[in-house]
Swiss-Prot record:
InterPro entries: EFG_II (IPR041095), EFG_III (IPR009022), EFG_III/V (IPR035647), EFG_IV (IPR047872), EFG_V (IPR035649), EFG_V-like (IPR000640), EFTu-like_2 (IPR004161), G_TR_CS (IPR031157). Pathway: Protein biosynthesis; polypeptide chain elongation. Mitochondrial GTPase that catalyzes the GTP-dependent ribosomal translocation step during translation elongation. During this step, the ribosome changes from the pre-translocational (PRE) to the post-translocational (POST) state as the newly formed A-site-bound peptidyl-tRNA and P-site-bound deacylated tRNA move to the P and E sites, respectively. Catalyzes the coordinated movement of the two tRNA molecules, the mRNA and conformational changes in the ribosome. It is found in: Mitochondrion. GO terms for cellular component: mitochondrion. The lineage of its organism: Eukaryota, Metazoa, Ecdysozoa, Arthropoda, Hexapoda. GO terms for molecular function: GTP binding; GTPase activity; translation elongation factor activity. PANTHER family: ELONGATION FACTOR G, MITOCHONDRIAL. Keywords: Elongation factor, GTP-binding, Mitochondrion, Nucleotide-binding, Protein biosynthesis, Transit peptide. The keyword Cytoplasm does not apply. Transmembrane segments: none annotated. Gene3D superfamilies: 3.30.230.10, 3.30.70.240, Elongation Factor G (Translational Gtpase), domain 3, P-loop containing nucleotide triphosphate hydrolases, Translation factors. Pfam families: EFG_C, EFG_III, EFG_IV, GTP_EFTU, GTP_EFTU_D2. This is Elongation factor G, mitochondrial.
């Protein structure tokens, strides 16, 4: 039925509107299902410090691009919660825990968006997201500015060479100062950054933004800022906008030759000249364009989407390489073809795992070729063959089936047994692997047990799922103290998993006190020469190993290495894996405090074998004996995790806060102040940070806040080492506890 037919039959206007809505809905669904050409694809992440407004910004993006019909707020104030916060716990806490993936269309471009967590305890989620993205939007709060997690995200973007543009959000907040934030980007992040927009008023006065490139004022009108009205720049801001535009051109001329020539020749740069220079410089990570707005008040979001298309790269502008790995050879880097023509074989990377209602959901990025429903794919790590029954694209926790995916697409598979960082190919002869995703070691452990013993089955299921999903979440059983331990990136990380066990598996758990993941290491090199010989009737055991156990440099003190330097046949090659196994088993538990060994290198230089009595087991036991001899003869020390701590509070509490950090053996690395508030940066041992949140709140009348993130491992203080050694000896029954003795 056409509109004219509806009118002729005197149907109600409501019926005509309903018909149009259905047509629009159908056409928009068809649009989302389309496959775009390479130049019309953007894979972006939205990263920032906690509470900078990332999820709210994503919600607005989805609304303006027609992906959702209505907007909801974070923290579920309207009992719905933001679309991208699909987990019940996320809606309650108002923080994003898992990166939700979605795709949308803006001006005939397909934008894949990963909304990432801002809390430091979920850093591995950000790492995974950035690994598979081509560009990112760095969201900063116009009050908080550059904060500790912003520095972390910035380092991660640098590691994966991700170009970014900055969005200074929350202009409507009291104390908003985007100019100070720009200064911090230049001083703290070392970004060559400049405004491409200026705010027209801040706080309650926030009316719109000025586009410095096109020299126009933009006002966001109608409900939800859907209509953008262009106008002349307000008279009282013309001088400032001219100065800021000149500043933008100067910053670009330092890194872009074309605009640099125009600047030196004092010729006027056109809009196209400036936009071209911004794009070229941003792709090289030589410049960061800075946009402004307030997502909550619906101002500045559409121009940000335009900037994503104008200044961030499409998959063809980013070089992605795979490694060709062959035995006993150095891996060779091979560039991947991003063309969406399917001429090259498929290569994809699994960057996230999630256990859903229908089995394991695996998020992948297609780097090369095309993948169709019904194809067979191979996991290059395990060699497993998988037949694809279903391909989906994701919109937060909702799925849309597709028949094929091309290079540059982000998609998901069901029921694929794999690990995060695995590479998939359709041609099993391709011995390729994408560079693996960097995963930090956990720094905090807690004892954990189900509150009710009848829940053990559910507890085991939850642990199995969470350890597979999150490589920074570890689980082990400590036989010495007969406790099950979970380890992670912080207290909040472990608390959230405990709450998820209760909520998702109906298994309430009890967490013990947090324990720091100390490590033991050698102070200097120590030689070993150990003979393992056993004869008790029948085949005996004979193996001799000699070499050096030495410390690794400080930047490698969280790893252990094994190197075979033997020449000739004194130690047959088939026994080398046994020696390495023996070394790695002994590295699980040190002599001083029972913690793992790290920062050491086992150099096997010589040995001896017997033609009958030698075996892999004999050499494994010889390696263990060699480590025991180094325990006795070498000099050992305990390492502890050092955290980067950032504390913000009103100026009148500065002395108190610094005093508290000094008391906790902190080293102050910097301070800064602005508008009655100060921020202090310090490096503090994690062992001294427990209970700090309560102390800070009570000493600053609830106004102080802090964040911390792992920095490195460093030797602990002598008194701490002495205490740890004594506690371990007491637990092993090697010495009697004096306090216990007095009680008895």
């Amino acid at each position: 039925m056409t509109i004219s037919n509806l009118i002729r039959s005197r149907c109600s206007l409501a019926a005509a509107k309903s018909f149009l809505e259905n047509v629009k809905s159908f056409s928009s669904h068809a649009t989302f299902a389309e496959h775009k050409q390479l130049e019309k694809i953007r894979n972006i992440g939205i990263s920032a410090h906690i509470d900078s407004g990332k999820t709210t910004l994503t919600e607005r993006i989805l609304f303006y691009t027609g992906r959702i019909k209505e907007m909801h707020e974070v923290k579920g104030k309207d009992n719905v919660g933001a679309t991208m916060d699909s987990m019940e716990l996320e809606r309650q806490r108002g923080i994003t825990i898992q990166s939700a993936a979605t795709y949308t269309i803006w001006k005939d471009h397909n934008i894949n968006i990963i909304d990432t967590p801002g809390h430091v305890d979920f850093t591995v989620e950000v790492e995974r997201a950035l690994r598979v993205l081509d560009g990112a939007v760095l969201v900063l709060c116009s009050v908080g500015g550059v904060q500790s997690q912003t520095l972390t995200v910035n380092r991660q973007m640098k590691r994966y060479n991700v170009p970014c543009l900055a969005f200074i959000n929350k202009l409507d907040r009291s104390g908003a100062n985007p100019y100070r934030v720009l200064g911090q980007m230049r001083s703290k992040l070392n970004h060559n950054a400049a405004f491409v927009q200026l705010p027209i008023g801040v706080e309650s006065n926030c009316k719109g933004v000025i586009d410095l490139v096109k020299q126009r004022a933009l006002y966001f009108e109608e409900p939800y800022g859907l209509k953008i009205r262009e106008d002349e720049i307000p008279a009282d801001m013309r001088t400032e906008s001219a100065e800021r535009r000149q500043e933008l051109i100067e910053h670009l001329s330092n890194v872009d030759e074309k605009i640099g020539e125009l600047f030196l020749e004092e010729r006027e740069a056109t809009v196209e000249d400036i936009m071209g220079a911004i794009r070229r410089s941003t792709l090289k990570r030589a410049f960061t364009p800075v946009l402004v707005g307030t997502a909550l008040k619906n101002k500045g979001v559409q121009p940000l989407l335009d900037a994503v298309l104008d200044y961030l790269p499409h998959p063809g502008e980013v070089e992605n390489v795979a490694l060709v790995e062959k035995k006993d050879e150095e891996p060779q880097k091979v560039p991947l073809n991003p063309a969406r023509d399917g001429k090259d074989p498929f290569v994809g990377l699994a960057f996230k795992l999630e256990a859903g209602r229908f089995g394991q959901l695996t998020y992948l990025r297609c780097y090369q070729g095309v993948l169709r429903k019904g194809d067979n794919i191979f996991n290059t790590r395990s060699g497993k063959k998988i037949r694809l029954a279903r391909l989906v694209r994701l919109h937060s926790n909702q799925m849309e089936d597709v028949n094929e995916v091309y290079a540059g697409d982000i998609f998901a598979l069901f029921g694929v047994d794999c690990a995060s960082g695995d590479t998939f190919v359709t041609n099993p002869k391709l011995e390729l692997s994408m560079e693996s995703i960097f995963v930090p070691d956990p720094v905090v452990s807690m004892a954990i047990k189900p509150t009710n013993s009848k829940d053990r089955d559910n507890f085991a299921k939850a642990i199995a799922r969470f350890t597979k999903e999150d490589p920074t979440f570890h689980f082990e059983y400590d036989a010495d103290v007969k406790e099950t331990l979970v380890s992670g990136m912080g207290e909040l990380h472990l608390e959230i998993y405990a709450q998820r066990m209760e909520r998702e598996y109906n298994c309430p758990v009890t967490l013990g006190k947090p324990k720091v993941a100390f490590r033991e290491t050698l102070i200097g090199p120590c030689e070993f020469d150990y003979l393992h010989k056993k004869q008790s009737g029948g085949q005996g055991q004979y193996a001799r190993v000699s070499g050096i156990l030495e410390p690794l440099p400080p930047h490698q003190n969280t790893t252990i290495e094994f190197v075979d330097e033997t020449m000739g046949t004194n130690v047959p090659k088939q026994f080398i894996p046994g020696i390495e196994k023996g070394f790695r088993q002994m590295a699980e538990k040190g002599l001083l405090s029972g913690h793992k060994l790290s920062g050491i290198k086992f150099r096997l230089q010589d040995g001896a074998h017997h033609i009958v009595d030698s075996s892999e087991l004999a050499f494994m036991l010889a390696a263990q004996g060699a480590i025991k001899s180094v325990f006795e003869n070498g000099s050992w020390q305990i390492l502890e995790p050092i955290m980067m701590v950032e504390v913000t509070a009103p100026e009148e509490f500065q002395g108190t806060v610094i005093g508290q950090l000094n008391k906790r053996h902190g080293i102050i690395t910097g301070t800064e102040g602005a508008e009655g508030w100060f921020t202090v940066y310090a490096e503090v041992p994690l062992n001294d940070m427990f209970g700090y949140a309560g102390e800070l709140r009570s000493s600053t009348q609830g106004k102080g806040e802090f964040s911390m993130e792992y920095s490195r491992y460093s030797p602990c203080m002598p008194e701490v080492q002495e205490k740890l050694c004594h506690e371990y000896q007491v637990s092993q029954g090697l010495v009697v506890d004096k306090k216990q003795k007095k009680k008895n």
